[in-house]
Amino acid sequence: MGMTIIEKILARKAGVAEVHAGEIVTVEVDMTVLIDLQFATMWMQPLMINDASKVAIVMDHAVPAPTIKDAAGGPNARKFANDYGIERFYDVGRHGICHQVIAENGLARPGEILACTDSHTCAGGAFNTAARGLGPAEVYSILCTGQTWFQASPTIRYELIGSMPAGVSGKDVFLYIADAFGDATNSNLEYGGPGLASIPLNDRRTIATQGAEISADFSTFAYDDVLAEHFDDLGITSYEPAHADPDAAYAAVREIDLSALAPYVARPGTVSRNGVSVDEVEPRKIDQAFIGSCANGQLDDLRIAAEILRGRRVAPGVRLIVTPASQQVYRDAMRLGYLQDIADAGAVITNSTCGACFGYHMGVVGPGEVCLTSSTRNFTGRMGSTEAEIYMASPATVAASAVAGHITDARKVVAQWLQVSL
């Protein structure tokens, strides 16, 4: 019996011929990523680490530190990096949301295993990587031993056909999947098929990242020319992609016709079986619009927002907050003029941080407020008050809605303006 992508990676890293659903294996971990929150809460420096070249540290969730407790974590992180000679240390100023930093620096590579304490680590699956969020205790163990264990879960295959229409993004693809099929608890997600070639890497990253919202174990994409070009651009050639066997056993194979999709919105509470076409929630008034996070704070997301906002103004009574996914994205967007267009429209642009996404700082919503976000989660209380409502949509939908003052279809709004390449 053949193997899926994840089964292939687990087998290779366990040093065995085959792995199939239900089996437990101990595997070598290629990269372990630590984030700032670990160093601010109950940090105890290990007495040894297995391999400093396989460790990275990223300051991301609480940057700049909004509390004394968070500020105290910084010295812990710097001491740890210095004591063990960890060169991949992305301190404040070089930082970004860890999954963006992982992408920019090629830390998630085809056919490899990456672990991190952040729940959205499945974002690395866009690179044909077995990327998984784990608890702090397990990550400590990996630091010391270089290994961890996994039980291989059944895999759901999404066979993509067609191509996304104008105005439809990876966010819409995910929201459709989450609504149509619901949770994927104790399952892996695998994306492939002829339609994959039409999905840009930034949209693949959005889809992979959001796998956490439907409780997937791994959320992994097939290796193709898009990934080959990406790693060539980074100057990285040392990797071995994993390809699913033709006779791989899947729990389900679901065909998604990308050309049939439209902009989607997840209603407050959850993304699972809770999405609708944007027309069904228009014209819900909003108080805050947010563009950012590891899922949708990438350079292309800011380009789309800038093109929609250029020459226009955010509606009275609406605050638009934009958070680039990394300081590198921030600098690139500044050089390209995107941030100028966004700021001129009346938006607030923050430094790179996870702050607003998890309701910590730089965009917390209050009681009775309605927020439309392109971030990762919309459960009650996620971005602040438990009495707030959080709708989730693509950056295009968020930007257009910020101008309209209510949730709206960006395609309709843009059609009334000059042409914008969504």
UniProtKB/Swiss-Prot annotation:
User: Which top-rank group of organisms is this from?
Assistant: Bacteria
Q: Is the keyword rRNA-binding in the record?
A: no
**Could you give a GO molecular-function term held by this entry?**
metal ion binding
What's its top-level EC category? lyase
Instruction: Report the catalytic activity.
Output: (2R,3S)-3-isopropylmalate = (2S)-2-isopropylmalate
The reply on keyword Ribosomal protein is no
- Cofactor list: [4Fe-4S] cluster
Any binding details for the cofactor? Binds 1 [4Fe-4S] cluster per subunit.
Any idea which UniProt keywords this protein has? 4Fe-4S, Amino-acid biosynthesis, Branched-chain amino acid biosynthesis, Iron, Iron-sulfur, Leucine biosynthesis, Lyase, Metal-binding
What is its quaternary makeup?
Heterodimer of LeuC and LeuD.
Recorded hits in HAMAP family, A to Z, give: LeuC_type2 (MF_01027)
Protein name from the UniProt record? 3-isopropylmalate dehydratase large subunit
